[in-house]
Amino acid sequence: MYWGRTSLITIFLLALLSSSAWGGAWCMPKGSLYSKLSYNHYFTVDTFDENGHKRRNPNGSSFRDENITWYNEYGLLDNLTLFASIPHKWLKSRYKFTEGRGLKSTTFTYDGLGDVDLGIRYGLLKEPVVLSLQFLTKVAWFYDSDEAVPPGNNQNDYELKLLLGKSLWPFPGYCGLEMGYRWRTGSPSDEYRYLLEFGMDLIKKFSCRIKLDGIASVKNGDIPKQKPEVNAYIDYDTGQLIKTVSEPSGPGSAFTNPSLGYEYDLGKLEFTLGYACTKSWAFEFTYTNYPYGESIAAGDQYSFGVVYYFSRK
């Protein structure tokens, strides 16, 4: 039996893998529950421009996303897993600008639920590799379209992914590959999704994971046109009307949430250290860096999570 032969590493893999809705190819055993409550802190003062260069925001404008996210997986069948992710966000966008000879700032905030992920994962193969097909829908049911700092693009999206996983047993580790496509129902471009990961046991009760989570724009977004800014004044020496026209700085630049975009590429490199207290309880600490991207905010994120796992097997 597959589950019997790998029972010693099942909990290890689940503790490493299922930290997000992209939790690896493994399905949960029937009747099993995985639940993770995490605190996440993201902060940025930088933006990737359209050429992929990281630049400091004008005048040091900043954005902060603090959230508590509850993620759950449930094994409906041995090869069929349901999952959901529910975040509560505290967003703060501080915009700094020059006025006269001084520097001023204005702050926008949001406190409430963000986009909710709902999905299903179906196991196709268990040997020689684990192969699964996953469908996810992202719903924007819990906030308005005119929020001062939008927690999302206020649209429902759909994603289909193929997930591959391989246990490296008797070496206490695994590797994974994920490839998918996300259909976006509003103005933003559709996205190619990809993920590479490797995890291993370190010493007794400690494990680690490294993950590259990437987004590549399909470049089919409906980008709203921004009007150039026009200023005019009278030159009293000549009596002429002087008019100046400045080009817009680019789509999405006016967002109070710079982590949203219409057409962007982004890579997130995640490092996780896990500690298993018991077979049912574990803790995780994660640092996420944004090493590359285009037309989107850069930044760093720190996360701390408490994991609970229950299995009837």
Predicted ranges, named:
Residues 197-313:
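Outer membrane beta-barrel transmembrane domains
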Residues 79-84, 127-131, 170-175, 205-210, ...:
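Repeated loop/turn-to-beta-strand initiation elements of outer-membrane beta-barrel proteins
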Residues 33, 66-70, 114-118, 158-162, ...:
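Hydrophobic, lipid-facing positions within transmembrane beta-strands of outer-membrane proteins
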Residues 41-67, 97:
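Surface-exposed strand-loop-strand hairpins of Gram-negative outer-membrane beta-barrel proteins
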Residues 93-183, 188-189, 225, 229-262:
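Outer-membrane pore/translocation modules
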Residues 26, 73, 121-123, 161-167, ...:
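Transmembrane beta-barrel domains of outer membrane proteins
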Residues 35-37, 84, 120, 133-135, ...:
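Membrane-embedded beta-strand positions of outer-membrane beta-barrel proteins
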Residues 39-45, 86-92, 124, 137-143, ...:
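Transmembrane beta-strands of outer-membrane beta-barrel pores
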